Amino acid sequence: VAITTDQGMEDVARLINNVSPNAAYTYIATGSASTAESATQTSLGAENTQYGGQRQAATCEYEVPFKSKWEILLSFNGPVSIREIGLFNNSSAGRMFMRHVYDETMSKVSGQNLKITIYYTMVRV
């Protein structure tokens, strides 16, 4: 399960009452760090920057009921290790809405593809 960061929580609160909302979160980044998720994090531990593993604009959708969906298809042209993903509001730097660390590292090589889909579901508690 991913963690919503403090930046993400702040931006949702700003968006719903239109008080200085930040840019939409439309970019998915991958990285290789295994540091546990924390609400105070503002970036990935070790973001991938080459060979097809770098940050990409996502296809964004709304699904009923109450789900936001982001999806990218990565096509690798060299070796990439993926252990973490994050959702950002800019193609470089920017604010991080959420971060997830996988249990194990995925090792990808040239010629392989990987589809990443992120869902964010609003729930009542």
Predicted regions mapped to residue ranges:
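Small cysteine-rich, disulfide-bonded extracellular modules of the LU/uPAR three-finger superfamily
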Residues: 1-83, 89-125
